[in-house]
Amino acid sequence: MSKIGINGFGRIGRLVLRAALDKGAEVVAVNDPFIDVNYMVYLFKYDSTHGRFKGTVAADGGFLVVNGKKITVFCERDPTNINWASAGAEYIVESTGVFTTIDKASAHFKGGAKKVVISAPSADAPMFVCGVNLEAYSPDMKVVSNASCTTNCLAPLAKVIHDNFEIVEGLMTTVHATTATQKTVDGPSGKLWRDGRGAAQNIIPASTGAAKAVGKVIPELNGKLTGMAFRVPTPNVSVVDLTVRLGKSATYDEIKAKVLEASQGPMKGILDYTEEEVVSTDFVGDTHSSVFDAKAGIPLNDKFVKLISWYDNEFGYSNRVIDLIKYMQSKDA
C-alpha cells in the first residue's frame, strides 16, 4: 500500500496519525513549520481530550519514532519545498487548513506527492464522504477533499432518509464543540465578529457550509438543505439536529428501523445507532462518522421529523481521512 505524508501536525494531523496506526496505514513523513520534532513527541504523546498515546513515541536523530517506526520530519512553510519523495510519501493529508483549493494543494506535487487529500471542505476539489459517494472517485483525480466533520455526520444520515423516505427539504443545526480557530477570551476575528467572543463563556451562533455541502455529495439534495451552527464550550464531540420534511409518510419507528438497518449493513463502521441514554462525552474516541440517537429524535407528524446524530468531530473524522485514502489506493492500484 502507498505511503502517507501529513502536512500540518495540529488536532487533525495528530489524530490522523493515530487513526493510521489503528488501521494499519503507513505514515512515513510529517511536515510542520511551527513544531520541532521534540515538541511533536510531546503533542502526540499527551492529548487532553483523547488521552495519552498507548504506544511508544520518541525523537531520534531528527526522526519522529512511533511504535519503533521512523517518520521523517520536515519543517517547511512552503509546500513546494517539502521533499515527500525522499521519504517515499505519495498520498498527502493536507491538514493545515490553509491549502484547501486544488491550486494550493497541488504545491505538494513538486516534492513528489501523487495524491492530496484535503482534511477540510474545498471550494473546487471533488468532495467525498465515506458511505455516501466514494463510487464517484476516479483515479485521474489528483486533489480531493474529505469534506468537513459535520458533513461526514450529516450526509450518511441524509442519504438513508432520502433513499427510503425522500427529503423534500430540511434544515440542520450542529451544536458544535470548540475548535482551535476560536478565542479563549474576547478578541478580534476579522469579519466574523461573533466568532471572536470567548469560547468558554458563550454559546456562539456561527455559519457552516456543511448542510449545503451535502448537495455536492448527494446531488439529488442540492438546494434542499441548509443550516447553521452553535459553538458551545465543550472540547470535543458535536451533534447534528436534522429537521426534514419527507416526501413519503413514515412513522418514527419506521425511520429508526431503516437507520438501524443501514448501520448494520452498507454503512457499518460509518453510521452507528444507539437507544442508550447518552450524552456528548460518551462519544469521545468514537470512530463512526455519525451515531444516530434514536431516543433524542422526535416526529411532529408522518412527514415532518427532527433527527439527532452525534459525532466525535476530531477522531471520527480523522478515521475517515484514512478510510478515504485506503479507498483511493484500492482504485489507483
From Swiss-Prot:
Domain of life of the organism encoding this protein: Eukaryota
Pathway(s) served: Carbohydrate degradation; glycolysis; pyruvate from D-glyceraldehyde 3-phosphate: step 1/5
Residue numbers marked as site, Activates thiol group during catalysis: 176
Protein's cellular compartments: Cytoplasm
Broad class of the protein's primary localization: cytoplasm
Residues that, per the record, bind D-glyceraldehyde 3-phosphate: 148-150, 179, 208-209, 231
GO molecular function (one): NADP binding
SMART domains according to UniProt: Gp_dh_N
One Pfam family recorded for the sequence: Gp_dh_C
Reactions catalysed, as given in the entry: D-glyceraldehyde 3-phosphate + phosphate + NAD(+) = (2R)-3-phospho-glyceroyl phosphate + NADH + H(+)
Protein residues bound to NAD(+): 11-12, 32, 77, 313
Top-level class of the enzyme under EC nomenclature: oxidoreductase
One annotated Gene Ontology cellular component of this protein: microtubule cytoskeleton
InterPro entries referenced in this protein's UniProt entry, alphabetically: GlycerAld/Erythrose_P_DH, GlycerAld_3-P_DH_AS, GlycerAld_3-P_DH_cat, GlycerAld_3-P_DH_NAD(P)-bd, Glyceraldehyde-3-P_DH_1, NAD(P)-bd_dom_sf
Known EC number: 1.2.1.12
Disulfide bonds listed in the record: none
Catalytic residues identified in the record: 149
Keyword Nucleus: no
GO biological process: glucose metabolic process; glycolytic process
Gene3D superfamilies xref list: Dihydrodipicolinate Reductase, domain 2, NAD(P)-binding Rossmann-like Domain
Keyword terms: Cytoplasm, Glycolysis, NAD, Oxidoreductase
Family: Belongs to the glyceraldehyde-3-phosphate dehydrogenase family.
Subunit details: Homotetramer.
Designated name of the protein: Glyceraldehyde-3-phosphate dehydrogenase
Lineage: Eukaryota, Metazoa, Ecdysozoa, Arthropoda, Hexapoda
